[in-house]
């Protein structure tokens, strides 16, 4: 599976997901599913591998989820071509360098469509200046081979970055080039081509919007920055510090002046909106000034908690992106009492797996 993909089954697995999603949504009177496919291979922009040492040899491995057996991975067609090229080049360079290979147990890759890559080397040992010198030489060698690479070393309570711990992605979204800073070890959408389709779908279903947009869990601003052109103003919340910093950078780089990011959890924001308590982080922002008629949510796999469901149902339109249709359905049992589903989409973020990413637009009855 890891060294080859059953590309001949791509369409049939997508059809099966489409039928499954349509059945799940039938109790909620959902319209027909709009389907957005993925490239059949080289679609995943990040990958993590354990490293196996066998005498002088060194190779990437993964573990079979059922048998737990290790699988040697020399090529990984799931991942971007850039990751595949780097996998080969990197191991060729470090296998003869004891400082770089000793107790190396994992390598993480994060690549972009803009042809940049971050490589994180994880060790079960202390890494120091000697490691840094060797890693710097390694990076220069890889740059000379044509790679635009950031190299990071990680060990217990240690992180050494040779230059930056981020890369800037450029995505073409509905005729505009959007710049997104992606930070190592922070969440980014794994399938860039499908992410573009998700952003364009969200833009199309919110065309001719009135009022402002509220977004919970905004990450690096992936959706809020793309959607800013459809709304007067956007107010977005995010809890993770690196993501908030990346979002602020992305706002500046994309010359967007109508988006405000607040660092707080969806739960705290719910309390602030309901006037339960005041928060220092909201100083200078009067929530009453915003006329948010649309709310956008892209929650974790667990879905929206009860209090957030109570918050979102107050909005005329709810745009909900879900990476777990089961928890979406649980939330819909409440939301369907006040709203109807006007749009339904399936995004094949994770081909050849049972995972489904979907989007619904709910409008007040």
Curated annotation (Swiss-Prot):
UniProt-annotated binding residues for S-adenosyl-L-methionine: 189, 217, 222, 238, 298
GO biological process: tRNA methylation
Highest rank taxon of the organism: Bacteria
EC numbers for this chain: 2.1.1.-, 2.1.1.35
First-tier enzyme category under EC: transferase
Keywords: Methyltransferase, S-adenosyl-L-methionine, Transferase, tRNA processing
GO cellular component: a single term: cytosol
Pfam family, one: tRNA_U5-meth_tr
Family: Belongs to the class I-like SAM-binding methyltransferase superfamily. RNA M5U methyltransferase family. TrmA subfamily.
Protein name as catalogued: tRNA/tmRNA (uracil-C(5))-methyltransferase
């Amino acid at each position: 599976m890891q060294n080859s993909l059953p590309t001949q089954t791509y369409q049939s697995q997508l059809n099966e997901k489409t039928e499954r999603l349509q059945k799940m949504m039938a109790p909620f009177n959902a319209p027909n599913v709009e389907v957005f496919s993925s490239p059949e291979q080289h679609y995943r922009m990040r990958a993590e591998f354990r490293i196996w040492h066998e005498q002088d040899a060194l190779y990437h491995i993964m573990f079979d989820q059922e048998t737990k057996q290790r699988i040697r991975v020399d090529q990984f067609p799931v991942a971007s071509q850039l990751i595949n090229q780097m996998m080969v080049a990197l191991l060729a360079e470090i296998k003869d360098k004891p400082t770089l290979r000793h107790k190396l147990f994992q390598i993480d890759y994060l690549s972009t469509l803009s042809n940049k890559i971050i490589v994180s080397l994880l060790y079960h040992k202390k890494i120091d200046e000697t490691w840094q010198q060797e890693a710097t030489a390694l990076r220069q060698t890889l740059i000379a081979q044509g790679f635009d690479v950031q190299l990071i070393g990680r060990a217990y309570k240690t992180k050494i970055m040779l230059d930056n711990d981020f890369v800037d992605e450029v995505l073409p979204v509905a005729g505009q080039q959007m710049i997104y800073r992606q930070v190592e070890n922070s969440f980014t959408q794994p399938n860039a081509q499908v992410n573009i389709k998700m952003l364009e779908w969200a833009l199309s279903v919110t065309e001719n919007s009135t009022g402002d947009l509220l977004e919970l869990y905004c990450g690096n601003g992936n959706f809020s920055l793309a959607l800013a052109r459809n709304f007067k103003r956007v107010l977005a919340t995010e809890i993770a510090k690196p993501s908030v910093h990346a979002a602020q950078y992305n706002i500046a780089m994309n010359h967007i002046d109508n988006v405000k990011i607040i660092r707080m959890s969806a739960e705290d924001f719910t309390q602030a909106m309901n006037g339960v308590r005041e928060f220092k982080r909201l100083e200078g922002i009067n929530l009453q000034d915003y006329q948010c008629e649309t709310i956008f949510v892209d929650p974790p796999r667990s879905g929206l908690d009860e209090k957030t469901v109570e918050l979102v149902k107050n909005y005329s339109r709810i745009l909900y992106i879900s990476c777990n249709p089961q928890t979406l359905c649980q939330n819909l049992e409440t939301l369907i009492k006040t709203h109807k589903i006007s749009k339904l989409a399936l995004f094949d973020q994770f081909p050849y797996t049972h995972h489904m990413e979907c989007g619904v637009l709910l409008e007040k009855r």
